[in-house]
């Protein structure tokens, strides 16, 4: 027994030294996201953030957590890991800005079978870039090395964000009325939803791979599918300084049909004009190649619209001018009407 080799944590598959090296690699990336309210550097037990609540009459915190889903499979296939972090931040911060909240800080969780510091650093590069785009600070995270739990080279991600809004400025859709206009902000592509369907159509049905080129797309299939989710925070906060936005919907899983009603009061319907915005080529490729019914496209994918705003009819054109000045591709895609029958809000596509 005394001659038995002494075991270490590294022998069991957990490399503490690799974890320490990873922390050193990401310190500049974390620092690049800092805000004046951040009180701690990376490496502490918790991230400290000094809330300047005196700027608000009734400060209200808004929180959200999310992941990237099977889009990660594309990152594994292409061995490209520096953009999925943007997706992670986007999925969280876009969900809180729809209530009028400014994102304050972000935390991430990464779990993998074997930690490769340089690969994990690439992931954090994306998270850092996403936080910069959203104006929030990356104040902490967890990187879990879990031998035998994930396939070789694979990992999973989760994110968490907290934002703030004055209680009197919370956007909940309750003020939406008949005649209000719907403005759609263009997506960059699939964003972070519909990847199980996309992989089935493109890789299984068509027999393509990540490096395949098809005439419908300017990029390879993998590059198109890995386009980062758009972060709408700064655009929306800019609008809120000067205009009334009555409701917003982040168009994720469930598409326009399922997400738009989430912001609407009862007895209303959103009339959406299907020909009011151009459909990006990736969606038409999926629809035709997969023989997917149009209705399924609208209730599964964002179909080219990543965010929907409900605004007063009297302000719609001026808001469109502002959006153009912000280099935002935006379209008036519909209006609010009274429901034909009393009950839950609905979407009508015409």
From Swiss-Prot:
InterPro entries given in the database record: PurM-like_C_dom, PurM-like_C_sf, PurM-like_N, PurM-like_N_sf, PurM_cligase
Chemical reaction(s) catalysed: 2-formamido-N(1)-(5-O-phospho-beta-D-ribosyl)acetamidine + ATP = 5-amino-1-(5-phospho-beta-D-ribosyl)imidazole + ADP + phosphate + H(+)
Known pathway: Purine metabolism; IMP biosynthesis via de novo pathway; 5-amino-1-(5-phospho-D-ribosyl)imidazole from N(2)-formyl-N(1)-(5-phospho-D-ribosyl)glycinamide: step 2/2
MF term (GO), any: phosphoribosylamine-glycine ligase activity
Any one annotated GO CC term: cytosol
Localization of this protein: Cytoplasm
EC numbers on record: 6.3.3.1
GO BP term, pick one: adenine biosynthetic process
Top-rank taxon, per record: Bacteria
Coiled coil: none
Class of this enzyme: ligase
Alphabetical keyword list: ATP-binding, Cytoplasm, Ligase, Nucleotide-binding, Purine biosynthesis
Entry's family note: Belongs to the AIR synthase family.
PANTHER family, A to Z: TRIFUNCTIONAL PURINE BIOSYNTHETIC PROTEIN ADENOSINE-3, TRIFUNCTIONAL PURINE BIOSYNTHETIC PROTEIN ADENOSINE-3-RELATED
Protein name: Phosphoribosylformylglycinamidine cyclo-ligase
Lineage, uppermost ranks: Bacteria, Pseudomonadati, Thermodesulfobacteriota, Desulfuromonadia, Desulfuromonadales
